[in-house]
UniProtKB/Swiss-Prot annotation:
GO terms for biological process: rRNA base methylation. Keywords: Cytoplasm, Methyltransferase, rRNA processing, S-adenosyl-L-methionine, Transferase. Belongs to the methyltransferase superfamily. RsmH family. It holds the Pfam family Methyltransf_5. It is found in: Cytoplasm. S-adenosyl-L-methionine binds at G32, G33, H34, D52, F78, D100, Q107. GO terms for molecular function: rRNA (cytosine-N4-)-methyltransferase activity. The keyword Lipid metabolism does not apply. The gene is rsmH. This is Ribosomal RNA small subunit methyltransferase H.
Length: 307
């Protein structure tokens, strides 16, 4: 089959250093592009578990494209990665893990999912539609201060207070149920002099991250990755905005440096760091950005487990 080629594909394949007989986890299956690349590099005894909390990503028709005895596809969030690995008896044996964080292209392109401010659809934004709270439910009942806090904390939106007030004012007239309605509210609330990109970009990002617990799940997943990897195993994390990357960077720093106070008399050679960063932050090439403009904000960090 001809698989979709995802962002930073070549860099991820190189970063995972795939062994033909290795065990790998793709924590964000999506369209299956990274998983397909891993399978191409595995031998007959290699194994891959692909996870995704979006039921559309792990739908039967998608699984049919990946009929392969070496692959198991699991409908589950990567926040439960350790349990899924443990259920297979792989804990401490995994040679590589990939996390490609954030919303996928199919989710953005499907207006019915409600992720995009450029396509009118129901204001949903749930990556897993079985989840109870959607964006419209929250927007129409949250206190103004809670909306402001979400827009600031998860979107770093400078005009969070103005937008939150505009949302509350608008919903007093009628419930906000469509993506276009929310987008129009944000546009009207935004100072014209500040419009350099679409005014709703940060608002939609913030609400999506909040509704899907994206940062919480990433925070829960990273320590699990460390525990499930074998010594010498690799972790590759692709993020698309500073909030995610900052969280990943801090985790790597925490696990790759000395935590002991300087006054404790232990030699540097006796300190056991758990992770080693491999190279610096990787960004897509200009050629890739030209082919796929969405790749522009992608960032890849690669680490290896030492102990």
């Amino acid at each position: 089959m001809e698989a979709h080629k995802p962002v930073l594909f070549d860099e991820v394949m190189e970063g995972l250093a795939i062994r033909p007989d290795g065990i790998y986890v793709d924590g964000t299956f999506g369209r299956g592009g990274h998983s397909f690349g891993i399978l191409q590099r595995l031998g007959p005894n290699g194994r891959l578990m692909a996870m995704d909390k979006d039921p559309d990503a792990v739908a039967v028709e998608n699984k049919a494209l990946f009929e392969d005895a070496r692959l198991s596809i699991v409908h589950e969030t990567f926040a439960n990665l350790q349990k899924a690995v443990r259920d297979r008896g792989w804990e401490g044996k995994v040679n590589g893990i990939l996390l490609d964080i954030g919303v996928s292209s199919p989710q953005l392109e499907d207006a019915k999912r409600g992720f995009s401010f450029s396509k009118d659809g129901p204001l949903d934004m749930r990556m897993n539609p079985k989840q109870s709270m959607d964006a419209a439910s929250w927007i129409n009942q949250a206190a103004m201060e809670d909306i402001r806090r979400v827009l600031w904390n998860y979107g770093e939106e400078r005009f969070a207070k103005r937008i939150a007030q505009a949302i509350v004012n608008a919903r007093e007239e009628k419930p906000i149920t469509r993506t276009q309605e929310l987008s129009d509210i944000v546009i009207k609330a935004y100072p014209q002099r500040e419009i350099k990109k679409h005014p709703a970009t940060r608002t939609f990002q913030a609400i999506r991250i909040f509704i899907n617990r994206e940062l919480d799940e990433l925070r829960e997943c990273l320590p699990q990755c460390l525990e499930t990897l074998a010594v010498g195993g690799r972790l590759c994390v692709i993020s698309f905005h500073s909030l995610e990357d900052r969280l990943v960077k801090r985790f790597i720093q925490k696990e790759s440096r000395d935590h002991l106070p300087r006054e404790i008399p232990i030699l540097a050679k006796d300190i056991k760091h758990r992770l080693k960063p491999l190279g610096s932050l990787i960004r897509p090439t200009e050629a890739e950005i030209k082919k796929n403009p969405r790749a522009r904000s992608a960032r890849l960090r690669i680490v290896e487990k030492l102990s």
